[in-house]
Amino acid sequence: MTKFRGCIDIHSGQVKQIVGGTLTQDDSASSKTSSAKENFVSTKPSSHYAQLYKDYNVKGCHVIKLGSNPANDDAAKLALSTWPHNLQVGGGINLDNAQYWLDQGASHVILTSWLFTKNEQDKMELDFGKLREISKLIGKEKLIVDLSCRTVIENGKTNWYVAMNKWQTITDTILSAEFLLKVSAYCDEFLIHAADVEGLCKGIDEKLVENLGEWCPVGFEEKIVYAGGAKSINDLDTVAKLSKGKVDLTYGSSLDIFSGKLVNFTDLVEWNKANSKTN
């Protein structure tokens, strides 16, 4: 059954909520300015949010490092140490550091840009050689593939192309049932941000959610996490209906714990309890 999942997005060492399409540059220590539109910048440490998810038993939450600033690593480690082996971590994960982050207490590592390489047409596409290698190294049960995407309308048809590099680079990889089935052989979950609506609080991409439910590989029910645009607790009911309970939903900027005015965290917790056989 569909459930609410939490997030902790970290940028320049702080927990933030950012409009997805505006994250155009890295937050390295040498970068003095940022073009990112920030909906929320927390004065609290990442551990505050990790403790909140722990206290209310919100399972499967992800910690995302939005840039290479070393302070992001410190904040991610602080969150992981607050609830060891229960939070997922992503951002800059590769073959060399995946096991390190598991050792730091992550339940899973989330793969994003590293998975993609240029093809013969000089376009980026998912590299199954890399995916197989890292899956073999750490085990598919510890691996999540981030397939966040942007909407592209071609000849009147809507496609969702996987986007990398802070969602600024559109790859040659298109989401489909066949593609998700192929990737699912090497990982435990999918994380899919709808980058065009991320952080806007103007509604979810309902057609994408519906398609994800239809495309869901056997055994991946409740292992696809959608993020982007959630603005009401009713979005959980919508996602449950559209995906037939197969897709989970993340809330960010609309949530009161991130100074949002639209959704109460405790209401989402209660929704999970009322709609889950395991809670």
UniProtKB/Swiss-Prot annotation:
E.C. code:
5.3.1.16
Record keywords? Amino-acid biosynthesis, Cytoplasm, Histidine biosynthesis, Isomerase
Any idea where this protein resides? Cytoplasm
Q: Does the keyword Cell membrane apply?
A: no
Q: What coarse category fits the chief subcellular location reported for this protein?
A: cytoplasm
What Pfam family does this protein match (any one)?
His_biosynth
Please name the pathway: Amino-acid biosynthesis; L-histidine biosynthesis; L-histidine from 5-phospho-alpha-D-ribose 1-diphosphate: step 4/9
A Gene Ontology biological process annotation?
L-histidine biosynthetic process
Instruction: State the source organism's domain of life.
Output: Eukaryota
Q: What protein family is recorded?
A: Belongs to the HisA/HisF family.
Q: What is this protein called?
A: 1-(5-phosphoribosyl)-5-[(5-phosphoribosylamino)methylideneamino] imidazole-4-carboxamide isomerase
